[in-house]
């Protein structure tokens, strides 16, 4: 969602990294995570604290602005802070990775003061909700075997191609690849449809993920706190139904990465209502 950039100011050896926005009276990330001295990005990473203004607060930690951001440890630290807050059942508006401002005063003056009301409204809508993301990957050999069994045209072309020298079978190989790719795309769409049909009723909002070669099926779900166990069980049941063909992975509770921007950028009724 929102991001912040360094202010035009005299360079300093310290700056504020901003993770996201929470209610001003929410527990800090160390309390939410049940661990003292909770840390985020940077080398070494500094403790995360809150900068409050009115009803909202920014989660920040100090960093050295001269050190480039973007290491795997930085990315993990950014998500770890936000997801710990979400797991503690605190509403949070996650910022994109890399939001940096000059100092705590700039956090207030440039971020919280001008946008505080929008942040407060969005946090109210996200209260009691967290994101769960479900990703599915194919068992490639099993799925290809199933395609050959269920598509006689593909099975015939595969047999014809195997019987020809490689140079002579190039057109057939290209056609075979096209047919298999199209069938995989159809199955990915059907899988995503079933995923949303099975799990969507347990969420207040859903976002279908764009399919990719390594993740053909996936979606994110905004789930009420009291339905987390039910959602987890339903995901396990779907995974059991798909066992041997598609491996499901459930991530969550997470900060609402796929939903927060729609609230802040589109004031008014919740986009999913």
State where each predicted segment sits.
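An interfacial alpha-helical scaffold signature
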Residues: 1-273
């Amino acid at each position: 969602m929102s991001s912040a950039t360094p202010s035009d100011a005299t360079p300093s050896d310290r700056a504020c990294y901003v993770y996201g926005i929470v209610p001003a009276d929410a527990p800090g990330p160390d309390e939410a995570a049940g661990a003292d001295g909770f840390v985020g990005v940077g080398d070494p990473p500094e403790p995360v604290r809150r900068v409050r203004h009115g009803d909202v607060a920014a989660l920040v930690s100090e960093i050295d602005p001269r050190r480039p951001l973007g290491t795997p440890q930085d990315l993990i630290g950014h998500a770890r802070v936000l997801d710990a807050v979400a797991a503690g059942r605190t509403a949070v508006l996650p910022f994109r990775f890399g939001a940096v401002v000059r100092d705590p005063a700039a956090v207030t003056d440039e971020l919280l003061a001008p946008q505080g009301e929008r942040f407060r409204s969005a946090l109210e809508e996200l209260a009691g909700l967290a994101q769960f993301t479900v990703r599915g990957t194919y068992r490639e050999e099993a799925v290809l075997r199933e395609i050959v069994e269920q598509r006689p045209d593909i099975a015939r072309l595969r047999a014809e191609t195997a019987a020809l020298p490689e140079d002579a079978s190039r057109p057939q190989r290209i056609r075979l690849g096209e047919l298999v790719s199209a069938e995989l795309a159809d199955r990915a769409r059907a899988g995503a449809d079933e995923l949303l049909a099975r799990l969507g009723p347990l969420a207040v909002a859903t976002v279908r993920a764009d399919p990719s070669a390594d993740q053909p099926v996936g979606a994110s779900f905004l789930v009420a706190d009291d339905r987390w166990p039910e959602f987890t069980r339903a995901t396990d049941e779907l995974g059991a139904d798909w066992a041997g063909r598609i491996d499901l992975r459930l991530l969550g509770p997470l900060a609402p990465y796929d939903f927060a921007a729609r609230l802040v950028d589109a004031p008014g009724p919740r986009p999913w209502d």
